[in-house]
């Protein structure tokens, strides 16, 4: 707990750096909304690839990983599709499906913003994503 306040400050700083960077690319990515009076210590920064783009989550994920940037899918899929949820899901929900959850599963990715990342690391992540986007032109 002694390190918590410092870790929290670093995570918020890294989160805000990502937020500032991705603000320039609203047409490509959906980014998190933060609500007033809610304090979150993000371990990772979620981004969702918008529909009708020239690339997929997989394309971006492979590019980042090839450039030594670790990524994760948002969650590990649509948890509502797990067999354990079969009895909890109503037939109405099965009929309508879970399009938003499926979309996030297919198009969502997490990039780091934890306290282990330095300003230099965050800048590197942004530089690599910028290069990826420029390759689309």
Task: Describe the predicted segments one by one.
Residues 1-137:
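PLP-dependent aminotransferase class I/II
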